[in-house]
């Protein structure tokens, strides 16, 4: 019964399950669900990141897209790709960035060899705690160049700085998640798609919250108190979706000077 299933998920949170119209033995189906892979500890970014360096030059091609003002290239950004959405790259080009894309498993020296003005850390799938190679790389880059992270990139920054993440009982999915901007007390409607979050009580003293989810009070954004580093859990580049937070790309450009 669909209603019974919804009630169970609402009370107990997201869980593994099997839907079948072939095998009808309940015991076998339960065992299949139990033996299926879990998201916890899964480094899925390895499966979707590119194998080699590339460049990205395409900005917005639709003249009706006006939420970021076109700007001539003034900054060089290295984007670490853990499964990046292409509209993020378009947004970076739109604000005046020459973009070099590197695989998410590159080293900090690989990044610095490109002599970027700023570093972008992308979204991607899986458990952020499992992407340990990225924790190391990012920790070595903090303070060297301005850094901006989105979604998984936000979570990886947290780990690199000593914080931790946890699996949400109910993942944030959809394009109407309300987020409070703590700097101006304005509410932004955001697009979100994540099952893990950064533990706010695990943030080191060097990091401070900037955005909070109004549905469950979880952390949605943070910044470094003294260094040019910021990140958000949601998707300011959403396509399609709300553009209340597109200013973050311009804030990143301003961080680069």
Predicted segment positions?
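RNA-binding accessory domains that recognize and position tRNA/RNA substrates
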Residues: 2-115, 128, 239-241, 251-257
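Hydrophobic anchor at the start of a short beta-strand
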Residues: 99, 147, 229
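Catalytic beta-strand/loop cores that center a nucleophilic Ser/Cys/Thr
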Residues: 185-227
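A glycine-centered loop/beta-turn motif at secondary-structure junctions
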Residues: 221-257
